[in-house]
Amino acid sequence: MGDEKNPEKDFEKEKKKKIEKEPEKQTKKAPKPKKKKKKGKAGFLFILLILLAVICAGVYLLIPSKNRVSHNQYFGLEDDNQYGLIVNSEIVDITNGAPFEENGVWYLPFSTLYYNISDAFYYDGLALLYTDPLQTYSAAPGESFYTDSDGIKYTLTYQPCYFKDGSLCIALDYLKLMDYSYYTVDDTMKSIWVFNDWSKQPRTSLLKDTKARTQAGIKNDIVTSLATGDVVTVLEQGESWSRVQTQTGLVGYVQNKMLGEIKEEAKAVPDGRPLPKYTNIAMDEMVVMGWHQVFSESGYSQLDDIISTAKGMNVICPTWFTIKDNDGNIQNLGEKKYVTKAHKAGLQVWVMLDDINISTDGLQVFGTTSHRKTLIAAVIDAVKELGADGINLDVETIKSDVGPSYIQFIRELSAACRKEKLVLSVDNYSPMPHTAFYDRTQQGQVVDYVVVMAYDEHYVKGPEAGSTSSLAFVKQSAERTIAEVPKEKVIVGLPFYSRLWCETPAESESDKTDNSQVFVDNSDGTYDSKNNKYLLSSKGVSMEGENNIIREHDLSLTWLDDVGQFYTEYEENGSWYRLWVEDENSMDLKMQAACSYEPGGVAFFKLNMENKETWSIIRKYTDK
């Protein structure tokens, strides 16, 4: 038989195995707990590093930059040898020509000087001219002298001007002599500072040594070092830093704590020379001027009627002088007895000089020095012979290329008038971009009165019918002129007339029946019209003429608030007629607007086109 299993024996074996295994389980070592990292020490080191970094950064921020800006960076130049140019407090773009030194004398190209420093110099193709209140000085290129209007010669140790590489260049010493534009040279910074602003400005002395920097903040580059007591001009004040200009013209920022007491002070002229004074003649009362337009005679026969009607007028301006030819000769319709009668009536007489002769060339007349001299001499002699009180210059036909020559003529004429104690007034269009070349700012510096013609808003041979002088146009004309000219020198010119406009349907230019018409293609609706294509013409109408038209056609009037005038229209023979009425109502609003700017006067074009009621309105604003 085979072996049999013994359950009892088997149980004992299993029990024994179990007992043998249990001590192993009991004696097995428990795993060691993991050691905890020392987080406290590591965190402390990390925080310490951050603190050190912050402290270092703070220290860095507190350490002023010692880096100095290069002259190339400061002036935006590429050439290390080129000198930068500062005019008053502005860095100048010298693309028109940089300053340079020649035989120990500093020069500037004429274009750089003219557009950035002084446009009072004028080159006529033969000589460089400069006109002060009483004289015109002339320097020929390459010569070492200049002459005045009386022919007196002044010798210099340098050439006031000469040509270099085809460009006219002006000595800065001559600029200083003529224009009172002084200069300093900083060889360290390679800069030239030209200054001619003698107005009061905030200035102060520095309390400590310091640095002027390119921007506010000590980390910005240094422009220049400054010492205790140095005087600076404060250009802009900030909370902690201010923008200042140093005594060498450099501009930078310094901390406010370095500035002493700031006072408004004018810079003294370095060599003590008195600044030139452009004295002017001003009436003790508001100017109330009337233009008396004449064509073939003096107008003496009309003077009694004018005087009886124009109660309140104190200046009469007869249109007697016209430029006759390019050489500067004039046509003169004046009569001494006219002046005598006007004076007896308490009126000053300012004779008009105009350029209505279309055969003359403005560039020939005003651009040639000998022609200007002839014209000025002729006008001054004629005014003195007549016993008149002044000149009213009315030049309306020149183009922009004549602008500088015309301004030079005004300078020279003003000097001649100043010597003879004659009033000089100059008529101007309402300021617009295309008439900027009339340079009202320069006019305002040298003449007695600048007249703005606040009329011809819509004009002969213009493309659109409209008011001769809307209320808004009067305000705009006065505001823009006073922005360029001291208000006490401004005379606001107003119209005594309107225009009757005629619009006739047409297809082309060939439909014109006379030269007074202009063909207008208004297909795009740009203008206020009844027709897409039309011929437009107009004629000047007096206040009495307006009334006749209104009565003849039995017209009703509509008041236009935005224009400040009555308006009417009618159709006749296929044409559309329109009229913006000038009367005592529109004049009242215009006078109120003009006088609100406190100008030196008002003027009216033209006498004999007004009614008596108009002068009552005028006196309401001028008799104060």
Describe each PLM feature range.
Residues 2-4, 38-238, 268-278, 282:
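Primary recognition of N-terminal secretory signal peptides and signal-anchoring hydrophobic helices
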Residues 266-378:
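Glycan-recognition patch characteristic of GH18 chitinases/ENGases
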